[in-house]
Amino acid sequence: ALADAALRQCMPCGPGDRGNCFGPSICCGAELGCYVGTAETLRCAEENYLPSPCRAGGQPCGAGGRCAAPGICCSDETCSLEPACLEEAGERGGEPAQKNLTGLDASAGDFLLKLMHLAANRQQQGGKGPLL
């Protein structure tokens, strides 16, 4: 409980500072998705120099990660698709996820959903290697 009290929100990052740093090269937000190793994550390296620990994201997921964006679980080193994080987005109202999908035409939205389900099923089956 004492450790939880010492945690602060991780630094903002990404376009319009609408995301939060999850690690030195990971920036995620509900409306943004996740950036890994891009210019949007450069600011996140500064977290290593701050004296107090931080925590970003929602519910715990995966191996030491937290829900970072709808359907995505990130630790400080990596991100993966996580169906439980889709459920969390729905519990919060799901507005950002739905808003992002409505901007796509029907075929692009269907393709994205099929790709997310394929990746989630492959992960549950312990599949290794590329998705496609």
From Swiss-Prot:
GO terms for molecular function: neurohypophyseal hormone activity. Disulfide bonds join 10-54, 13-27, 21-44, 28-34, 61-73, 67-85, 74-79. The keyword Disulfide bond applies. GO terms for cellular component: extracellular space; secretory granule. It is found in: Secreted. Keywords: Cleavage on pair of basic residues, Disulfide bond, Secreted. Its main location: secreted. Belongs to the vasopressin/oxytocin family. Neurophysin 2 specifically binds vasopressin. This is Neurophysin 2. It comes from Struthio camelus (Common ostrich).
